[in-house]
Every structure is written in C-alpha cells, then in structure tokens.
C-alpha cells in the first residue's frame, strides 16, 4: 500500500494512537488548527489528553480495537508496537496508516524554510530558544517542539511566516522522514542503543540526515564536537559553526556566570559582537544552545539584537530543570534528562542552587540504555548527596531479566555514592518524606513518567492541607 498523504484526509476522521505523547499532542493541535477532524487514544490521562479534550478532540484512555472504527486514517508513533490492539484492528480493516515522523515530514512540505534541530542532547531547549527568538524577531514561524514552551502556549505554534521549525529526533532514524533546508546539530553522543549498533552507527544516521539538505541550505553545527565537525566537512551546502573554540564562526565573548550558573556573554561572529545575551536558565550547556539559536537565526537574516533580547527573556521549557513546588521547606524540581551525560549536567546546575542536601531521584529509562551505559550511570549523580533509584522504566521494551535497578544501586555504592533502591513512586515518596529536611532540594530525572512523582507529592500535600472532607 502506498504511503497516504495527510492532505488527502482533510474533512475525514483521523485517529491518533498515543495522542498524549509530547510530539503527537503537538501534531494533533497543528492538525486541528488546519481544520482536520481527530479522535485519539492513550494509555494514560495527562494534561495533554485533557487539553486536547478541551479543544474538542474525543480522547479515549486505554487502547482497544473499537477506537479505530469509523476512522479513515490511523496515525501512530514508533512507541506503539505492532501488537497494539488498535494497530492490529486497523490492519485487519485495511485502514491506511501513517507513522508520526512521516506525518511531520508531510506537514513541513511546502515551507520555504524548514529548520530541523537535531542532536543527542539539547534538542528541546535549543528548539524552544530558537522558536522564541524567531517570534520576537518577527519571522512568525510555525513551530513543533518535543516539549512545552509557555511563550508559545504549548508545544506547537501555527504561524503565517516562511519558517517551519521542528525538533528532528534521531530515535529510530525518524528524522530521515523530514526534508530540512536548515539543520542544527547540537552534538552527537551515544544513545538509543536499542536501535543503533554503536556510536559510528549513530553518527552515520546524522550524516544521512544532513545530506538531505539542499546545496543552498545551511548546516549549523557544534564546532567543539569532533563528530559534528567531521560531518560538516562532508557537506556541499553552507556550514556555520558555534562553540568555544577559536575556529568557530560564532563564539561567546566575555563569558561570565552568576551564582546560579546562568551565563552572560556577547554573541560574536568572526570577532565582531552582534548582540548580548544574559540567560535566565543555568548551565554551561545552555550557552551552546543559545549560540546554536543565534547562529541559526543569522542564516535567516534575523535581527541578532532582537534574537539576543529574546534569549535573555527565555525562561526554559517544561520538564527542563523545572521547579514543580515546595513541601516542608523542600524545593522540588524535575528534569527530562535520562542519559548519564544529561543527568550529570543538570545536577551541576542543581548544585549551584541554594540548598541543604541535594537529592537525585533517577528513573532509569529502558533496559537497553541501562545495559549499554551501565558504567556511566554509576557515577553520573556524584554531585548529589543522596541518590534514589526507581525501577527501570521499560517504555517500548520487554524485561530481559538480566538488568535491574538494584544493580545500579549496588554499583553506585561501590563507587562511593549514597544510593537507595525505591522501586515505586509510593516507595520513593515515603522515603523522601521520612528523611528530607527543610532546605533540601529534590530533583527527579527521567523521560518516562517520573514527573508524575512530583505531581503525586504535590497532590498529597494539597490533600493534607485541605484536611478531612
């Protein structure tokens, strides 16, 4: 069966399996804005499913065959396995189906400027920064982010300008379904090792993505990452680099940090200062993200002073070192980081915040990732005073039986860390409430559902304050 095209289904019922996902919920909003009729399903009720329901989309919680009855097109993500009852029923009925990344590529078609932000780390933050910068600079872009940005009111924005900006995710090589005219590469590192064989395989996927660029296009890459620069040298299109190195096109000059780790710097191109940035989000990695946004905006002839002003107002994306509340004088934060390098980076920022003791609550994500990066996990929370480790979040995988969270805890202890296995959210909350002290800071980390622990603790606190009914 030929791949269906979304444009052929305007006015027809489209069903989205996994509609509550960060990307899928945004794409649903984009389709709604363009007049498409939608239904959806997800296995969890979340703010995303509730929000879509408020917009008029019938969303069913739980997957069953009946959900696709009456649909004329079914959209799914790679996280929805072939044995999902809705996918099975769609196939039985002969319904055309479309994978999420293919849909995104189709929605980008026809945009004069199609920007894809890729990289192992920093995609969402960089895309969010660039979105805010382009809006402030007057580009009126259409935006698709794999997270939520208050500045645009969520994960998507439908604009009337020439620019379509999206995250370009390397998992399952899904970014190869896109047709970018501009690509931003934040970095290339080991991840998604359930799909890729090794780092060379990962780098080759990025190579194939960059080679989708037209000759008149632009590749904007991290000039301090040798894997990125090696790929840039292979391209026929225009290339722009950013970073700390003296050979980078865009560099931060007069770089300083405040007590919370927030950077201030002049954005300099080939030695000429074109704007000043004072970030409100902490971490050296955000200097790279901001420079990437500046360099990319420059390729579109944006007013760099306005771009820098926008970056100076950037408050961060949801689930990126996001403060979620305070209980008993304890500050609660959450971060999406799930790779050891990301956890290490965000803990370096958390350590700079005022606190008594720093708690790291880690939800390891997928058995394959834990197995391949096991040694890195054992020391990545060294900046924390205490590490709590929940059971591994399986996501799309089945338990192979040979890797458990307790093995991480034992390895951390062997490396001198104070670590405790708290298998469930209830176990974790109980341990925290028994042992935390006023002035402590708790940071939950992971890209699974660990953010729901923060919600759970806040809900329990509100119920306690309300008293018996």
Report residues per predicted region.
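Structural beta-sheet core signal
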Residues: 16, 40, 143, 183, ...
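Conserved hydrophobic helix-helix packing surfaces used for dimerization/oligomerization
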Residues: 14-16, 74, 115, 141, ...
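Phosphate-binding loop of NTP-binding sites
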Residues: 5-7, 30-33, 53, 67, ...
